[in-house]
């Protein structure tokens, strides 16, 4: 890997790892709450508020639903995204951090918005189109927004469902290609999935997937 790519990985990977670590902490608290409920115990007010706030953030319906069902839905959305996938998507969208959006606006993932207060007009936007590229104060905020996007947007429902199947089956995301295949809606380019898979393997990004044993939580 050349110097620019190395520098990009050195800057972005710790932020990705931090996001996944936060998700692991949330998952464990949800699992603990679920186990508590399964013993027919009542959750503390703090835990109830915690679950309600997460449900709002991750667009999970709570009205007239048992808390265990709410937690089960949250566990589908609140799960890690393998480091290699996040790195590859960021590298692809930002030209390994060299794009104008990345250098001037901390926008690594090319996320769209229609909010004029949070976006800039892309240079090659087609006439009549109104989308903007979301900008961020820090790279951390860009990565955080990407995680929320993948973990909540309906376009990535297939990704989340497969991730749950893998999680339930063997708790290991060793074959990231399977997950990348479910991110075809991320871009209009029909070859997008193949491009991301190539970036992962050509740059041996899966070597970063086991950092901090991120993939061992139940």
What are these regions (language model features)?
Residues 1-88, 92-218:
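Catalytic cores of secreted/periplasmic lytic hydrolases that degrade extracellular macromolecules
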């Amino acid at each position: 890997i050349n110097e620019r790519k190395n520098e990009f990985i050195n800057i972005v990977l710790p932020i990705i790892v931090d996001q996944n670590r936060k998700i692991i902490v949330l998952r464990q608290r949800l699992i603990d709450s679920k186990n508590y409920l399964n013993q027919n115990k009542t959750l503390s007010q703090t835990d109830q508020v915690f679950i309600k706030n997460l449900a709002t953030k991750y667009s999970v319906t709570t009205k007239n639903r048992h808390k265990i069902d709410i937690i089960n839905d949250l566990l589908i959305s609140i799960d890690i995204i393998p480091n290699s996938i996040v790195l590859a998507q960021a590298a692809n969208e930002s030209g390994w951090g060299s794009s104008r959006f990345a250098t001037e606006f901390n926008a690594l993932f090319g996320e769209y918005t229609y909010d004029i207060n949070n976006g800039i007009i892309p240079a090659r936007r087609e006439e009549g189109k109104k989308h903007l590229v979301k900008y961020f104060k820090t790279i951390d905020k860009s990565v955080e927004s990407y995680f929320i996007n993948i973990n909540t947007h309906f376009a990535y429902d297939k990704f989340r469902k497969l991730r749950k199947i893998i999680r339930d089956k063997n708790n290991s995301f060793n074959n990231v290609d399977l997950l990348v295949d479910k991110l075809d809606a991320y871009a209009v380019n029909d070859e997008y999935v193949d491009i991301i898979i190539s970036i992962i393997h050509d740059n041996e990004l899966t070597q970063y997937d086991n950092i901090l044993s991120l993939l061992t939580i139940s």
